[in-house]
């Protein structure tokens, strides 16, 4: 029989008592009063901060947005179907943040930076706050490097610089996303990291964009953040900030980034839904009073950093959808006033077969011209003016029957210039090709061709110059100027190609 020794037992108990460390962990808790429509009202949580993450008993996370005298309004980051009235909630003491790393490149993630492409976890050692203050005045420098979109109409007349914010605005189905994805495709080999944020879109549309990027090898330098139409409003509202945090991570590491928000109208609608459910007072078009701040704090994060901070940049291309061309609605006017210019896409031009359907007359870039390369300035200087005069003449010519020869010539030139601005989707052009195309049009080399022959001739001319006059591209890319030598080479190439082309057409 085992003898029980009392002194041994008392020694063990004494040791355990001495080892006992009385740690008091204070947790700020509350109780669910009501829950529904993605909103929970909570009693308690006295010490909670605005924007703090709270955790429900069954694991759902929420953000405390409304701090009222007797309860806290929390928006849920999930469906919250298992949350019950009376269950407990605890404050986490953290503000929303996401992991960030190089490993995110080529992946499709959601607003919480969790992968949704079925390719496993993403390793990350660092994290960033989803909402962080924008760089101040001293931290920035003015925009001076071009960000080429590969679209002639934009790069020649509405140029975008690295660190600029340029709005893409237009009705539904006018090619807004196409302009944005073409810009991503054109960054291949330019050492620019792209972030595409899809907010409240159809999952099929997002899949189509991802497929296009994968086929063209553009996913290598792209991150897609997607919250589709069936996602909770909270996540649709957060997605752009998640994208911005990822782009900022690269920007502060001396890299160039491009971020596309597709589109901010849907984010504003998600925010309106949250605000109304939280019983915040509605303002114009039932949007809450701080919807301007919603977008301004997001877009101000795009910047060109100073040399002390490593000259990284973040260029933002927000997209806004208008209803039947109404640019004076609330969200469009807000975003126009925040950004450094806008590209206006018109449904009428799109339906008339002019694609990309950019309305050059009312599209502007407020800072990009400082970023244009000299060669482009030299050839594209008079393009915008000629097109504006042509549009005016065309409207007048509809009513006048007999036009003098000069007017007829100007109309013919305008039609050909409009033709050279047309481009197929996913076929961006290099700067050298754009310069060649514009020079051919503005100097009258296309005037003798039929309108239907213009695009075919230009395609063949680009191929001809690439194979027979490689020096042309070398001069432009090395000197960034349209030198006399380059002009002589181009004139020669145009003449030779024109003779070949006309012989082919006759044959």
Swiss-Prot record:
For this UniProt record, the keywords arranged alphabetically read as follows: ATP synthesis, ATP-binding, CF(1), Chloroplast, Hydrogen ion transport, Ion transport, Membrane, Nucleotide-binding, Plastid, Thylakoid, Translocase, Transport
Mind telling me which residues the site (Required for activity) is annotated on? Answer: 363
Q: Which Gene3D superfamilies match?
A: 2.40.30.20, ATP synthase alpha/beta chain, C-terminal domain, P-loop containing nucleotide triphosphate hydrolases
The enzyme's main class, written as a single word, is translocase
- CDD domains reported for this sequence: ATP-synt_F1_alpha_C, ATP-synt_F1_alpha_N, F1-ATPase_alpha_CD
Compartments where found: Plastid, Chloroplast thylakoid membrane
**Per its UniProt record, what Pfam families does this chain match?**
ATP-synt_ab (PF00006), ATP-synt_ab_C (PF00306), ATP-synt_ab_N (PF02874)
Q: What are the binding positions for ATP in this chain?
A: 170-177
EC number(s) on file: 7.1.2.2
Enumerate the catalysed reactions.
Answer: ATP + H2O + 4 H(+)(in) = ADP + phosphate + 5 H(+)(out)
Where is it found, in Gene Ontology cellular component terms? chloroplast thylakoid membrane; proton-transporting ATP synthase complex
Bilayer topology term: Peripheral membrane protein
The molecular function GO annotations come to:
ADP binding; ATP binding; proton-transporting ATP synthase activity, rotational mechanism
Q: What is its main location?
A: plastid
Q: How does it assemble?
A: F-type ATPases have 2 components, CF(1) - the catalytic core - and CF(0) - the membrane proton channel. CF(1) has five subunits: alpha(3), beta(3), gamma(1), delta(1), epsilon(1). CF(0) has four main subunits: a, b, b' and c.
Describe the function of this protein.
Answer: Produces ATP from ADP in the presence of a proton gradient across the membrane. The alpha chain is a regulatory subunit.
Q: Matching HAMAP family, A to Z?
A: ATP_synth_alpha_bact
What family is it from?
Answer: Belongs to the ATPase alpha/beta chains family.
Indicate what this protein is called per its UniProt record.
ATP synthase subunit alpha, chloroplastic
Q: Which gene encodes it?
A: atpA
């Amino acid at each position: 029989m085992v003898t029980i020794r009392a002194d041994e037992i008392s020694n063990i108990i004494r040791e355990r008592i001495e080892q006992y460390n009385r740690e008091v962990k204070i947790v700020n808790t509350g109780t669910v009063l009501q829950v529904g429509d993605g909103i929970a009202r909570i009693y308690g949580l006295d010490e909670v901060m605005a924007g703090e993450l709270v955790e429900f008993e069954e694991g759902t996370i929420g953000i405390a947005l409304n701090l009222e005298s007797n309860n806290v309004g929390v928006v849920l980051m999930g469906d919250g179907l298992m949350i019950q009235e009376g269950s407990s909630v605890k404050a986490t003491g953290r503000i929303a943040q996401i992991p960030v790393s190089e490993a995110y490149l080529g992946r499709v993630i959601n607003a919480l930076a969790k992968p949704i492409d079925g390719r496993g976890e993403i390793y990350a050692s660092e994290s960033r706050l989803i909402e962080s203050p924008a760089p101040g005045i001293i931290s920035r420098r003015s925009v001076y490097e071009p960000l080429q979109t590969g679209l002639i109409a934009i790069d020649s007349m509405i140029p975008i610089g690295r660190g600029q914010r340029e709005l893409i605005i237009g009705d539904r189905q006018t090619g807004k996303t196409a302009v944005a994805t073409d810009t991503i495709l054109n960054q291949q080999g330019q050492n620019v990291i792209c972030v595409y944020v899809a907010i409240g879109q159809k999952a099929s549309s997002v899949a189509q964009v991802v497929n296009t990027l994968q086929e063209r090898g553009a996913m290598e330098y792209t991150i897609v953040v997607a919250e589709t139409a069936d996602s909770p409003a909270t996540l649709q509202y957060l997605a752009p900030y998640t994208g911005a945090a990822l782009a900022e991570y690269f920007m502060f590491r001396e890299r160039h980034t491009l971020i596309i928000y597709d589109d901010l109208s849907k984010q504003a609608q998600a925010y309106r839904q949250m605000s109304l459910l939280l019983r915040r007072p509605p303002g114009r078009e039932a949007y809450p009073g701080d919807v301007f701040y919603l977008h301004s704090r997001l877009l101000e994060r795009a910047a060109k950093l100073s040399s002390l901070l490593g000259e990284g940049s973040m260029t933002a291309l927000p997209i806004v959808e208008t209803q039947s061309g109404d640019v004076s609605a609330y969200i469009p006017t807000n975003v126009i006033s925040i950004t450094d210019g806008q590209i206006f896409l018109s449904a009428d031009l799109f339906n008339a077969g002019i694609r990309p359907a950019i309305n050059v007359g009312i599209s502007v870039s407020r800072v990009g011209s400082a970023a244009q390369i000299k060669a482009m300035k030299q050839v594209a200087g008079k393009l915008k003016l000629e097109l504006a005069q042509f549009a005016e003449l065309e409207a007048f010519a509809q009513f006048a029957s007999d036009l003098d020869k000069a007017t007829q010539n100007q109309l013919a030139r305008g039609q050909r210039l409009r033709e050279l601005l047309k481009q197929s989707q996913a076929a961006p052009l290099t700067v050298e090709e754009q310069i060649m195309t514009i020079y051919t049009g503005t100097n009258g080399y296309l005037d003798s061709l039929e309108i239907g022959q213009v695009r075919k001739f230009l395609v063949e001319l680009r191929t001809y110059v690439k194979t027979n006059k490689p020096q042309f591209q070398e001069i432009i890319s090395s000197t960034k100027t349209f030198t006399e030598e380059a002009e002589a080479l181009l004139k020669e190439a145009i003449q030779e190609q024109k003779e070949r082309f006309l012989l082919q057409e006759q044959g």
